[in-house]
Amino acid sequence: MKALKPLLLFCVALCFATSCKKNPDMTLVQKTVYENNDLSMFHVDDGWEVTFVYDSLNSFVELEYSAYLEDYVSVGEVNEWLNFDFNKQIYKQAGSVFKATVHISQKEALYIRADNASIITMEGHFEVEDMDFELLNASICKSFEVTSQSCGIELSDGSQLYGVDFHGTNCTVYAHKESVCKGCFNVEQTFTTGIGINSQLIIFGGSMPSASIEVKEASTINMAEVEIKDMSVYLDGGSEATVNVTETLSGFLLSGSTLYYKGHPQIDVDCSDDSTIRPI
């Protein structure tokens, strides 16, 4: 019994210490920073939720986060990029808030990169000459309305981009490692895309005179709702594409891939024995 007494005292002390442990302060802290800025490059990291708002009159950043994160929030400029991050690894309590709203006025160029399960929202229609948009490592964006002369979109590692409404001169879309892109593309000149490793690109509507698509490693593209004059295709690794072409359709099908096409184009496609091209 005497031997058990120290153990019992230790257990009681441990329970007391646990019960007295303070819960984190979840009070919301709100700040306005970077007023009247000329920033055009934004890096969103570590699960931050950032909303970009087109604002023709003002440019500033509103921050909102749980008070216990005060010493860990890291929002600042690094090499012309405005970073939304934390300065060290920290366990984030359930219900924690760490988000920002970025008001952006008219820009010639806009670069947005989201990493590590961050969430992007874009409110309003953005008009820029040059747009570069990246979603990395399971990041998400559910609205993307952009008019741009040149636009580059890149998704990787399970990232998702929905609600695309693009109007512009040229556009490229790359999606890799189980990523998904869905929306409408109105392209005046050339649309180029590369999709790989179980990824998807689904285009619900729009227009484009020419397109070049590369689909690999069991990935899927569906462009049946967009009538295209000239298209080149490269399908490999059991991939699948559905297209709508009016004049010329050229390219290669390899390793058990399948190409479905609408329209009556002139076809010049090299097809491996285990691949298939079919009209619909």
Label the predicted regions:
Residues 20-136, 143-156, 162-175, 184, ...:
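Acidic (Asp/Glu) and glycine-rich low-complexity loops/linkers
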Residues 1-30:
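Bacterial Sec-dependent N-terminal signal peptides
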Residues 164, 172, 178-280:
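Short, surface-exposed interaction patches in beta-rich subdomains
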Residues 5, 15, 19, 102, ...:
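Short stretches within intrinsically disordered, low-complexity N-terminal or propeptide regions
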